[in-house]
C-alpha cells in the first residue's frame, strides 16, 4: 500500500524505471539507474530503492540484478449510492418505512445488483443469523421470496426483517425469527415483501 510522498530523487528513479521498462521490456540494473538519474554511488540507489519498496512503489529481489517490479496504481473502488432508510425492528415489527434519512455508499464490486436500499437494524430477533442491533442490511428490492430467504416485509403498516417460509402443503406463509425468544409471524394477503437481504455492514 502506498503510504508516503516521494522525494525528488525517488520520483526521478521511478520515472527512469518506467521509461526503461517501456523501451526495453525489462527493468534496469542498479548501475543503469545510477547513470540514468545522475547518481555516482550504487549504495545511494540501493537506499532509494529500499525506501521506494517500503513506501509500496516497487517490489524487488536483492539477489537478482534486474528483479525490479513497479507496483501498479490501483483504480479507485467504484462506489454505489443507495438510500438508507430508518430503523427496522428485528425484534418487533414496529417502524414503518419513511423517506430515506440519508444515502450511503457501498462497494459496487460487492453489490452489483440494481434496485438496492439499506436499513438499520434494531432488536435481536435475528441474532442467530448474525444480524445484530445497529447493523445495516443491504436489501435487493423484490416482491417474491424463496424458503430460507431473509426478507424485509411490510406487515400491517410496519416493517420487519425475518426469514421467509411458505408451507408447501397448506400455503401458509410465516416470517420466522432467528431467536428462540420470539414466535413466528403468520402473514396474510396484506403483507408485502419489500426485498431480500443480500448483505450486511457493521462498524466496530
Swiss-Prot record:
UniProt DNA-binding residue ranges: 30-50
UniProt cross-references to Pfam families, sorted A to Z: LexA_DNA_bind, Peptidase_S24
Any one GO MF annotation of this record: DNA binding
Chemical reaction(s) catalysed: Hydrolysis of Ala-|-Gly bond in repressor LexA
Keyword entries, A-Z: Autocatalytic cleavage, DNA damage, DNA repair, DNA replication, DNA-binding, Hydrolase, Repressor, SOS response, Transcription, Transcription regulation
GO BP of this protein: DNA repair; DNA replication; negative regulation of DNA-templated transcription; proteolysis; SOS response
Enzyme class: hydrolase
UniProt keyword DNA repair present: yes
Reported function: Represses a number of genes involved in the response to DNA damage (SOS response), including recA and lexA. In the presence of single-stranded DNA, RecA interacts with LexA causing an autocatalytic cleavage which disrupts the DNA-binding part of LexA, leading to derepression of the SOS regulon and eventually DNA repair.
HAMAP family according to UniProt: LexA (MF_00015)
Similarity comment text for this entry: Belongs to the peptidase S24 family.
Subunit-structure text: Homodimer.
Name this polypeptide is given: LexA repressor
Annotated organism of origin: Carboxydothermus hydrogenoformans (strain ATCC BAA-161 / DSM 6008 / Z-2901)
Classification of source organism: Bacteria, Bacillati, Bacillota, Clostridia, Thermoanaerobacterales
GN (gene name): lexA
Amino acid at each position: 500500500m502506498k503510504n508516503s510522498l516521494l522525494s525528488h530523487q525517488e520520483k526521478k528513479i521511478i520515472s527512469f524505471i518506467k521509461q526503461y521498462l517501456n523501451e526495453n521490456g525489462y527493468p534496469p540494473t542498479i548501475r543503469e539507474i545510477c547513470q540514468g538519474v545522475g547518481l555516482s554511488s550504487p549504495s545511494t540507489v540501493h537506499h532509494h530503492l529500499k525506501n521506494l519498496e517500503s513506501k509500496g512503489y516497487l517490489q524487488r529481489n536483492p539477489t537478482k540484478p534486474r528483479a525490479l517490479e513497479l507496483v501498479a496504481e490501483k483504480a479507485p473502488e467504484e462506489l454505489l449510492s443507495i438510500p438508507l432508510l430508518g430503523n427496522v425492528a428485528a425484534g418487533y415489527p414496529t417502524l414503518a418505512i419513511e423517506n430515506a434519512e440519508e444515502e450511503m455508499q457501498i462497494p459496487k464490486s460487492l453489490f452489483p445488483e440494481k434496485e438496492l436500499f439499506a436499513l438499520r437494524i434494531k432488536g435481536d430477533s435475528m441474532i442467530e443469523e448474525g444480524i445484530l442491533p445497529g447493523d445495516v442490511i443491504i436489501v435487493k428490492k423484490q416482491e417474491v421470496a424463496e424458503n430460507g430467504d431473509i426478507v424485509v416485509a411490510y406487515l400491517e403498516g410496519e416493517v420487519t426483517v425475518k426469514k421467509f417460509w411458505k408451507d408447501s402443503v397448506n400455503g401458509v406463509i410465516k416470517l420466522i425469527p432467528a431467536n428462540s425468544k420470539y414466535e413466528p409471524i403468520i402473514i396474510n394477503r396484506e403483507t408485502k415483501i419489500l426485498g431480500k437481504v443480500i448483505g450486511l455492514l457493521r462498524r466496530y
